[in-house]
Amino acid sequence: INPPVVLPTTKHSFVVKKLADQAPWIIGRAGMHYRDLIPDRLGGSIIASHIRIPDGGPVPDMVHYHSVGFQLIFCYKGWVDLVYEDQGEPLRLHAGNCVIQPPEIRHQVLYASDNIEVIEIGVPADHITTIDHKMELPNKTVNKNRRFKGQKFVHHKAEEAQWEKFRVPGFISRDTGIAKNTKNVAGVHIIRPEKNKSPETYHDSDILFNFVMEGNMILSGEGKEPFKLS
């Protein structure tokens, strides 16, 4: 049985979540700690989690896959060793780098540094995770151009990226290449300011998610009090 992925209609809202809010850490799969960044999940359309592994070392994970529409892993602090179907030998995901896990690509978390933290985004919020007891990784086939449900695996490395003007004046960004390789299912940019202030702007995305990695900023939303983020 392999039910289709159902993408719920997004229930749009303006949400700000701070680490200082003392949201609880929940112990989840393979002993990882999870903190929910979008509690209402916009009607089930998205889940965003802040994940940490306090004690580094081998991770008791198994080869598995997710039945999703989109999934991002962004390494915020530390590093983690991962292995993916058809992508060759294991890779080390360093802070500032990210991968997308295309729908149903088999993968496994192998080893983590102390106090690693990642941001994981999944669409939709509720999706099925399946253990693959038959596959061993790395597998013999290497096909880095393979598409999984129309999406290609992406491993974005900060040191190889180029900074360019962002769509919002006053910022520059590095494009991860995710939009191109998912056929615009999602896009991911890392941005930084060139100026202290930017003009009012808007977007036409279904969902826009921002995460402040370092520094601080003031976010003003229409009809909202300004939020200081850090």
Segments (PLM) and residue ranges:
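Short histidine-centered beta-strand/loop micro-motifs
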Residues: 60-67, 84, 91, 110-111, ...
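Conserved, short, structured surface segments that act as functional micro-motifs
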Residues: 110-112, 117-121
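Short, conserved beta-strand element in jelly-roll/cupin
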Residues: 51-55, 64-82, 121-124, 190-194, ...
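Conserved hydrophobic/aromatic beta-strand scaffold that supports enzyme active sites
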Residues: 34-36, 48-50, 72, 90, ...
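A generic beta-sheet turn/junction motif
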Residues: 41, 86, 111-113
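Short acidic-glycine-tyrosine-enriched beta hairpin
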Residues: 37, 84-105, 221-230
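A short, N-terminal "cap"/entry segment at the start of jelly-roll beta-barrel domains
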Residues: 2-56, 128-194
